[in-house]
Amino acid sequence: VLLCNEDGLFSFIELKVVKRRASKVDLSPHQCAWLSRHGHSSSFVVVREPNLNINVFAAADVVDLRLEKFSDCEPIEVFGNPYDWEEIFRLLSPPASV
């Protein structure tokens, strides 16, 4: 997903779902390569758990997400249901620095 905030800045979000907390996030080598290459940018991996929590990870963490169990990886933020969509958008598409 490509987001554009009100300042015209773009963010990239890779959306994933895990079936169990003990499983690994299903990321292809191509996805890992792209996210690793752009880990310094406003790029994220967003993972939904079976309990519907939304976990946000920095793109720089993509290799750990692919190789380690999901439950062993530390997200930037976890959002529970009901979701605060404004806060999620603020995290995923931050405004330009003043």
Region locations from a protein language model:
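Conserved catalytic cores of phosphodiester-cleaving nucleases, focusing on short active-site segments
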Residues: 1-3, 8-20
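Short connector loops at helix/strand junctions that flank enzyme active sites
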Residues: 8-12, 30, 39-40
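Solvent-exposed, well-ordered amphipathic alpha-helical segments
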Residues: 8-12, 66, 89-94
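Mg2+/Mn2+-dependent nuclease catalytic core
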Residues: 18-38
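Nucleic-acid nuclease catalytic cores
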Residues: 36-64
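Acidic, Ser/Thr-rich peripheral helices and adjacent loops at domain boundaries
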Residues: 62-73
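Charged phosphate-binding loop/patch that engages nucleotide di/tri-phosphates or the phosphate backbone
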Residues: 72-98
